[in-house]
Amino acid sequence: MLKEFKEFAIRGNVIDLAIGIIIGGAFGKIVDSLVKDVIMPPVGMIMGKMDFASLFLNLSGTEYATLAEAKKAGAATLNYGIFISTIVDFLIMAFVVFLMVKQINRMKKEAPAPVAASDSKDCPFCLSPIPLQATRCPHCTSNLK
């Protein structure tokens, strides 16, 4: 059983999958930082110095100035600012994956199949296709040798 597991784990597909998951996790962190630290601050500034991560609806009756205060008090909140950031995060990831798949598919396009050696030739007199071994054309009856 251990031998079977070793063969399974060493098989190329499993290793490729593991590498893909590791790279995907790291790429996800990069995109997350891009959204939170690069994209959302200018968008928030354009919209009146708004920090999207701090946008929330308080579902309890008590007033809280910030999301951190509401969380500290244990109040029920609807954190739509964080949700907006997550949607932007997802859209960027989906677009990048789309571009990667598109490029991979473009590189994968199969080359045209080589033309197989023909088993016929054209008659020099009537230009009809005839077998390579033919000594007389079956169409015009010309002698080919």
UniProtKB/Swiss-Prot annotation:
This is Large-conductance mechanosensitive channel. PROSITE patterns: MSCL (PS01327). SUPFAM superfamilies: Gated mechanosensitive channel (SSF81330). Belongs to the MscL family. It is a multi-pass membrane protein. GO terms for molecular function: mechanosensitive monoatomic ion channel activity. Its main location: membrane. One of its GO terms (cellular component) is plasma membrane. Channel that opens in response to stretch forces in the membrane lipid bilayer. May participate in the regulation of osmotic pressure changes within the cell. Keywords: Cell inner membrane, Cell membrane, Ion channel, Ion transport, Membrane, Transmembrane, Transmembrane helix, Transport. It comes from the Bacteria. It comes from Pelobacter propionicus (strain DSM 2379 / NBRC 103807 / OttBd1). The chain crosses the membrane at residues 14-34, 81-101. Homopentamer. InterPro entries: Mechanosensitive_channel_CS, MS_channel, MSC/AndL, MscL_channel. It is found in: Cell inner membrane.
